[in-house]
């Protein structure tokens, strides 16, 4: 039995209209990974799909996977005015509700775990105790998961 200490929130950095479970599985297989990057995926309609059993290790955050559960929402990208891909919090209302419900259930199951965004493990380069935007290795999940789920993190 794995000891879960972190629940990471991700975005898939993919298009909400065209992403499927099969396209996500194919993406991870094409990377040569033995396991997908997420345990759960939340689609724009709020439906939650299990991609990997919780007892198995996903490839969500390098060096943090053995003791983590990974949850992703589909989306997180758009084009800017110059047609460059940029990160965006484009979660639907249904995704927000489904994420909150799923994360609450996971936090109750793994009471000692902390809910974080993928970006929250970036190094604090200026040692001010905060991961500033310029320090982030990734923008994922495109919003402040630690702040948004602070009340859930109090469970435990």
Predicted regions and their residues:
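Generic preference for flexible, low-structure residues
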Residues: 23-25, 40, 56-58, 64, ...
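Charged, often glycine-rich, active-site loop that binds/positions anionic groups
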Residues: 48-62, 124-137
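Short, conserved "active-site rim" segments that organize catalytic pockets and cofactor/ligand binding
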Residues: 1-56
């Amino acid at each position: 039995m794995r000891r879960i200490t972190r629940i990471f929130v991700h975005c898939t950095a993919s298009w909400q209209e065209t992403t499927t479970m099969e396209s996500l599985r194919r993406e991870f297989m094409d990377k040569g990974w033995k396991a997908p990057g997420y345990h759960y995926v939340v689609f724009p309609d709020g439906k939650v799909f299990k991609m990997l059993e919780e007892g198995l290790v996903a490839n969500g955050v390098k060096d943090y996977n053995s003791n983590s559960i990974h949850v992703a929402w589909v989306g997180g990208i758009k084009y800017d005015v110059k047609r460059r891909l940029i990160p965006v919090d484009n979660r639907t209302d249904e995704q927000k509700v489904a994420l909150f419900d799923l994360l609450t259930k996971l936090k109750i199951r793994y009471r000692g775990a902390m809910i974080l965004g993928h970006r929250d493990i970036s190094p604090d380069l200026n040692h001010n105790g905060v991961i500033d935007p310029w320090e982030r290795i990734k923008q994922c999940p495109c919003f402040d998961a630690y702040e948004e789920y602070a009340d859930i993190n109090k469970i435990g």
